[in-house]
């Protein structure tokens, strides 16, 4: 029974890419800089898999005989956002980046949007999600106008207090936005950002919902499903791929829950693909430049690895990677253009292989496709032959 278990550590980059200067990200190294700022990271289980063999990380030494295979991957697509990174893993390489809106969205779009949803909006600026709800949250509560904002990424985000605009209404509003944002406005994601609390103490809830655009062609998840295998998605994976190929889905409320849901799927012992996104690294710590809690989250995930490894069956292969960087030690609160780590482990995987620098995230998807016996991806070169 062949299974691939793919865990995406959202934003855990491992050093700037050669074109980082084009994105304002020179010097970014999410995991490396966290380790330096912290005086070292304690990640013994990731270390044993070979994490310290990929790049220098203070406190994470290279292993003479790693238990896993190791390398890093470059992003071929332009961009540094969640959708672009995950799509490339699944075989989609973009020719041009999704549009961004550093000065906010066009006024004519906002007026048409307001007419469709029956409410004016406030905001329409580049902002941190946690900051803007503190600044505009009370005005929203008083007027009922949702808060629209964006970031350096290709997103249109709508924040609303759950007691002012109920979740279902917020989701309806976001669905309308997704429908309207086409052509030059075709952002990678529309995101519902519900929050609760009172003035001076507003806080985001875990009821976010992402509205992605449809992938331009068949992706890894579609192919696994067409093979008659299960595609088990944990966290925001289903949203990122607009539901493509997903046969089973478990929402998760943070990293701990995401690991629990992943283990639940592993224990079901059904052949196919289990794909998990652990979002706390990015959402709670990277964007907030919270070095200490980012470090603690990495160490907490490392502490769960023995349980994950012990649950693997004879023909399981575990892949651990990321989708971009989000270095909390820099002045920027946005994603960073970085290589992502690649760790592979399985009972049939030859340990200690250096997989080098892969030229595309799609190499990972191509490897999973070959292992599960699906048709080939449009992009990517499989490295399965280096593993088994």
UniProtKB/Swiss-Prot annotation:
Cofactor note (record): Binds 2 manganese ions.
Tagged with keyword Cytoplasm: yes
Cofactor list: Mn(2+)
Catalysed reaction, written as an equation: 2-deoxy-alpha-D-ribose 1-phosphate = 2-deoxy-D-ribose 5-phosphate; alpha-D-ribose 1-phosphate = D-ribose 5-phosphate
Protein name, UniProt field: Phosphopentomutase
Subcellular location: Cytoplasm
Entry keyword set: Cytoplasm, Isomerase, Manganese, Metal-binding
HAMAP family (alphabetical): Phosphopentomut (MF_00740)
Job description of the protein: Isomerase that catalyzes the conversion of deoxy-ribose 1-phosphate (dRib-1-P) and ribose 1-phosphate (Rib-1-P) to deoxy-ribose 5-phosphate (dRib-5-P) and ribose 5-phosphate (Rib-5-P), respectively.
Species of origin: Desulfitobacterium hafniense (strain Y51)
Positions bound to Mn(2+) 2: 282, 287, 335
Pathway linked to the protein: Carbohydrate degradation; 2-deoxy-D-ribose 1-phosphate degradation; D-glyceraldehyde 3-phosphate and acetaldehyde from 2-deoxy-alpha-D-ribose 1-phosphate: step 1/2
Pfam family, one: Metalloenzyme
Family: Belongs to the phosphopentomutase family.
Domain of life: Bacteria
Annotated positions binding Mn(2+) 1: 10, 323-324
Molecular function as annotated in GO: magnesium ion binding; manganese ion binding; phosphopentomutase activity
InterPro entries in the cross-refs: Alkaline_phosphatase_core_sf (IPR017850), DeoB (IPR010045), Metalloenzyme (IPR006124), Phosphopentomutase_DeoB_cap_sf (IPR024052)
GO CC annotation: cytosol
Enzyme Commission number, as recorded: 5.4.2.7
């Amino acid at each position: 029974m062949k299974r691939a278990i793919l865990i995406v550590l959202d934003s855990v980059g491992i050093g700037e890419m050669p074109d980082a200067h084009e994105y304002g990200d020179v010097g970014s190294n999410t995991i490396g800089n966290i380790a330096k700022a912290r005086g070292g990271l304690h990640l013994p289980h990731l270390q044993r898999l070979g994490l310290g063999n990929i790049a220098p990380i203070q406190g994470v030494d290279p292993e003479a005989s790693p238990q896993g295979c190791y390398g890093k991957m470059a992003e071929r697509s332009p961009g540094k956002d969640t959708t672009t990174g995950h799509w490339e893993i699944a075989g989609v390489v973009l020719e041009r980046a999704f549009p961004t809106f550093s000065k906010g969205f066009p006024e004519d779009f906002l007026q048409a949007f307001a007419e469709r949803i029956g409410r004016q909006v406030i905001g329409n600026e580049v902002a941190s999600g946690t900051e803007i709800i503190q600044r505009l949250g009370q005005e929203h509560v008083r007027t009922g106008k949702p808060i629209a904002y964006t970031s350096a990424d290709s997103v249109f985000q709508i924040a609303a207090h759950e007691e002012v605009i109920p979740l279902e209404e917020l989701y309806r509003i976001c669905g309308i936005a997704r429908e309207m944002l086409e052509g030059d406005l075709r952002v990678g994601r529309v995101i519902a950002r519900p929050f609760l609390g009172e003035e001076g103490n507003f806080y985001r809830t875990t009821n976010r919902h992402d509205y992605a655009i449809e992938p331009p062609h068949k992706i890894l998840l579609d192919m696994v499903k067409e093979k008659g295998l299960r595609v088990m998605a944990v966290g925001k994976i289903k949203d990122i791929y607009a539901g493509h190929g997903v046969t089973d889905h478990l929402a998760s409320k943070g990293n701990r829950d995401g690991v629990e849901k992943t283990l639940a799927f592993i224990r079901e012992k059904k052949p196919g693909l289990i794909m998990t996104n652990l979002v706390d690294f990015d959402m709670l710590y990277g964007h907030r430049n919270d070095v200490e809690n980012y470090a603690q989250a990495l160490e907490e995930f490392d502490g769960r690895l023995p349980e994950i490894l012990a649950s693997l069956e004879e023909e399981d292969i575990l892949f651990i990677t990321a989708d971009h960087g989000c270095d909390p030690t820099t002045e920027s609160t946005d994603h960073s253009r970085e290589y992502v780590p690649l760790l592979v482990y399985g009972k049939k995987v030859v340990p200690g292989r250096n997989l080098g620098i892969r030229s595309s995230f799609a190499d990972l998807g191509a490897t999973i496709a070959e292992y599960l016996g699906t048709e080939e991806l449009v992009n990517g070169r499989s490295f399965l032959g280096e593993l088994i």
